[in-house]
Amino acid sequence: MTLRVAIVGAGGRMGRQLIQAVSETEGVVLGAAFERQGSSLLGADAGELANVGHLGVQITDDLASQQDQFDLLIDFTRPEGTLAHLAFCVAQHKNMVIGTTGFDDDGKAKIQQAADSIGIVFASNFSVGVNLVFKLLEKAAKVMGDYCDIEIIEAHHRHKVDAPSGTALSMGEHIAKTLGRDLKTHGVFTRDGITGERKRDEIGFATIRASDVVGEHSVWFADIGERVEIAHKATSRMTFAKGAVRAAKWLAQKEKGLFDMTDVLDLNQL
């Protein structure tokens, strides 16, 4: 059975990559494509916009008008928009793949609640490599975490609006959970002025925003005399797009529940 996917933010950098990934994936077709009200891209053919050829899918700003054209929605936009799309999907009983980052606790709670009704894959990063890194971080933290300083450094393009990145925060959460720590208590997100000595149980974050960096993350487990670094560099957004479409195909078999890429990739077996 062919899965019909809708993409919101279809005209953005990630949206165009998602359209391309859908067009390259067997068993998946683009059913609908959406942009914000007032966008100059409304009415354009989504395939032509993404340089994959004419698809006959016009970009619109009205989810309700296209509700019969898609089975699942992929959303890599902003929290306020994603939550509005989430409410629509719950009402229409359509599953969602959510790659949006920057949610506050209330937003995350709404996603959790929605998963009682529909299937949701919610992840800070859809790269297969990054999700493998999450498992490596857990193993490193188990062996070294209580005896070394842990620092997370991330870099992204100048247009990214949230910091630290959702991926960096997820890395911190995986480490903190392994060590029995609360990231809200032990995470250090700014250092300025006379900060005093570093506490051993801190998990530090550093953020870089520059140019067109797609996404780079490095985690240090630093002890006196040695340092282990676990790093990931993305050179194309296509890695995230392909992962999201892979998640969509996997989620098509689920009625409801909240999942992440660990579930999609079956990484709990490692």
Swiss-Prot record:
Reaction catalysis annotation: (S)-2,3,4,5-tetrahydrodipicolinate + NAD(+) + H2O = (2S,4S)-4-hydroxy-2,3,4,5-tetrahydrodipicolinate + NADH + H(+); (S)-2,3,4,5-tetrahydrodipicolinate + NADP(+) + H2O = (2S,4S)-4-hydroxy-2,3,4,5-tetrahydrodipicolinate + NADPH + H(+)
Binding site for NADP(+): 36
Cellular-component GO terms for this entry: cytosol
GO MF annotations, alphabetized: 4-hydroxy-tetrahydrodipicolinate reductase; NAD binding; NADP binding; oxidoreductase activity, acting on CH or CH2 groups, NAD or NADP as acceptor
Binding annotation for NAD(+): 9-14, 35, 99-101, 123-126
Coiled coil, from the record: none
Top-rank taxon: Bacteria
Coarse class of the protein's main subcellular location: cytoplasm
EC number: 1.17.1.8
Pfam families: DapB_C (PF05173), DapB_N (PF01113)
This protein's name: 4-hydroxy-tetrahydrodipicolinate reductase
